[in-house]
Amino acid sequence: MKVIFLKDVKGKGKKGEIKDVADGYANNFLFKQGLAIEATPANIKALEAQKQKEQRQAAEELANAKKLKEELEKLTVEIPAKAGEGGRLFGSITSKQIAEALQAQHGLKLDKRKIELADAIRSLGYTNVPVKLHPEVTATLKVHVKEQK
């Protein structure tokens, strides 16, 4: 019997795949557990429509990420911090502080987990910080740490 998998089933198939399985296995296990549905022409059409919808959404997310990348690369975020001799900061600037400053200064809300700061910023000056907006899109944000007076 041909079935469409609704969830990944170890050793049998992945979500969205159409496979041939034993009738008893399909009726007694896959259908009852909600892991698969019968591969009727209507269900196959619905699956194709679902896949197209997901592709459109993925393309839209990628386009939005590219647009946001262009915006971010034009901006400079300024963060005031207390510093000692030689421009070393008391404490450090974290990705959370960068995200908060970005929202306060430019009105762009960005998740701090998307800001890929290898180590916290510990000195005054300009730093280029990578921001992963999408698996395929990484922007570079300029962060200016200036001395707080």
UniProtKB/Swiss-Prot annotation:
GO terms for cellular component: ribonucleoprotein complex; ribosome. One of its GO terms (biological process) is translation. Signal peptide: none annotated. The keyword Acetylation does not apply. It comes from the Bacteria. One of its GO terms (molecular function) is structural constituent of ribosome. Gene3D superfamilies: Ribosomal protein L9, C-terminal domain (3.10.430.100), Ribosomal protein L9, N-terminal domain (3.40.5.10). The keyword rRNA processing does not apply. Keywords: Ribonucleoprotein, Ribosomal protein, RNA-binding, rRNA-binding. It holds the Pfam family Ribosomal_L9_C. Belongs to the bacterial ribosomal protein bL9 family. Binds to the 23S rRNA. This is Large ribosomal subunit protein bL9. The lineage of its organism: Bacteria, Bacillati, Bacillota, Bacilli, Bacillales.
